[in-house]
From Swiss-Prot:
Entry's localization field: Cytoplasm
Gene3D superfamilies recorded: YqgF/RNase H-like domain
Organism: Gloeobacter violaceus (strain ATCC 29082 / PCC 7421)
EC category: hydrolase
Name this protein carries in UniProt: Putative pre-16S rRNA nuclease
Amino acid sequence: MRVVSVLGLDVGSKRIGVAGCDPTGLIASGLETIVRCNLGADLDAIRHWIERRRAQAVVIGLPRNMNGSLGPQAHRIQHFGQQLARVIDVPIDYVDERLSTVQAGRALQSVSATRRKALIDQQAAAIILQQWLDIRRCQHRPTQESLDERHIDTER
């Protein structure tokens, strides 16, 4: 069995949630919440996680409008993805992240408000990554096959 390592990102204006998957590519879990500083520092922090986890791909949540269109925030996320692509050597994919933060908040309902604020972004990143992993499994596309395609998908 080949080991799979993919990172999921929930990119916000103040924080970036980071998630990773288990070596089988079945289960995503939160890793860290990066407090945004400046673009260079943000990209360095993500690059650190890519190197540390030996990530083969990065999945970024793309916040579509409820009608499926891309709004200003989605365009900012795509721009961030383009900047990230310039400094890393792994493919980037995008996943519709509508309501991932709402789902994350519900999942953390029993956690104290202070702790929830610290965890919500990484939980949202885990939801984004889990969605990506599940889509590949449902399409009967092994995660490794998806990684081998090495593309940047901005149409999803």
